[in-house]
Every structure is written in C-alpha cells, then in structure tokens.
C-alpha cells in the first residue's frame, strides 16, 4: 500500500490524453518536476491551491453551469445567531433584545436550559417578544448550521488546530457580503466554557473580540451585541455580482467525508495516526476561502478517480 501514491502518480502523469477524452496542454516552466502533460480537466485542481484568500470575488467561469442567487435587500434577514447550550434565561432574553435592535431576526438555540416560561426571559427581552416566539430549538450544532453557507465561531481561547482566525470586524464584513446571497451563521458558545473543539470544526472562521485584559471573557449577550452591531454597520458590503456560487455547509461536509474516505481507501495514515487531528487540519485548509461549488465538484471528481484507480490497481 505504501507504494500506491508513487504508482498512482506515474499513472496519472503518463496517461495519454486520448484515454481521458480531453485535450492536453504542456506544463510550462523549468521548476515543474512533472513529465508529460496535464489534461485540461485536471487544471481546476491546481487552481484551488493557487487561489488568493478572497478568490471567491474573482470573475471566473462557472463549469457547473450554476448561477448565483439574486442579492436581497436585507442581508441581515439571512444571518442566523446560534447559542450553544445557553444556561441563563436572562441571557437568552438579552440576546433577543440585541437582535431586535440590530435588525437580525433569526435566533437558534442548541439544547438550551428551560427558558420559555421563565419570567427573567421576558424581563430581559423587553420589546422583543417576536424574536423569542420565532426562536428555534435544535439538539445539535450540526442541525443549527445546516443550510447555511458560511459559519463564524466566537471564542476567547487559543489552541492548536483551530480554524482560520480573523478579527471580528473582518469576519463580519466577510459574513455580511455572503449574506446578501446565502444564509450565514454566527455561533456563540456556553457561558461557562465556550465552544468545544468538536464544535469548532463546523466553523469556517474563528474570532476573538479584543479586550483590555489578558484573558477576556465577555458576557454572552455582550459578545452577541458586539458582533451584531458590526454586521448591522457593514450591511452595505456585497459580493461581486459575478462571483461563483458557494458550497453550502452540507456540501462542505460531504466533501470532507469523501476526501477522508478516499484517503482511508488507499491506506493513508497521518502523523501519529491521529485521524481526528487530520480531520481538523483538512477542514482548516478547505476553509481558508469560502468553498465554491465548482471546487467541491472538482474534489468529488478527484476522490472518485482515486476509488477507480485503486480498484484498477487491485489495492482493495
């Protein structure tokens, strides 16, 4: 099994273009160690790794034939505020009031403590009853972010293998630009210990709100207020109208599962055999720019070809 990557690489590099049914172009430049030619159908794979961090605003063709959804007038309507296991009814009420004041309507609670019939909820949510009435409860964070295209997580801690980090201002600009066309989510952790490592893997960006102290820990409703106000303040920012369509969170998860399954098929083992750590590294890598649908399609094709070639080489 250890010789598969070398064998497979030689097979791909020396495969005649006629077998693929596509035209081929030469690899230019003396720095490329590859022999032979690369089919045009394989070039989008290289494009993923050569793209600038904000490449999703570039003017490029869409090989999948899918078009961008039309922009909406109220991007804040597509912002989903998610609270993971909030323990205080007062915090839930305060967050509802923040959302009412900043024009955000969607509140999702993941496995919250009892709150609907608690007097403290109503006291703190003064004038925001419609936000509480429309609030949705789910059991897991996966359910809460399903259907969105971009997820921002908040934390006050640093750690290895965490996802791509940005300032809260930059993350809100990126989120509101995407919200003009797609649903986005801002995730807040528990009052006591925030988001777990397993929950952070569902986030494309991670932000820490700056503070005057070395170990800041804002109150939950205060953190929501700071992020919600930034979203409100930057809501005029938009993606370019010709930006390629983005993959949803659900499509992103399918890509990750397909890649991990393909690597397992060929006997790939990461450093120290820590597949959970490699899962986080892979997600961080794929999250450096919002994943476009065409990129997801290319990665699925690559994984399907790996399965095909592994069968042909009698690896299974």
What is each residue range found by the language model?
Residues 2-5, 39-42:
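Cationic, amphipathic, low-complexity segments that mediate targeting or membrane/lipid association
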Residues 3-6, 17, 62:
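N-terminal leader/targeting segments
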Residues 3, 15, 23, 29-30, ...:
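Ser/Thr/Pro/Gly-rich low-complexity, intrinsically disordered segments
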Residues 11, 15, 33, 40-316:
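Post-transcriptional modification and biogenesis factors for structured RNAs
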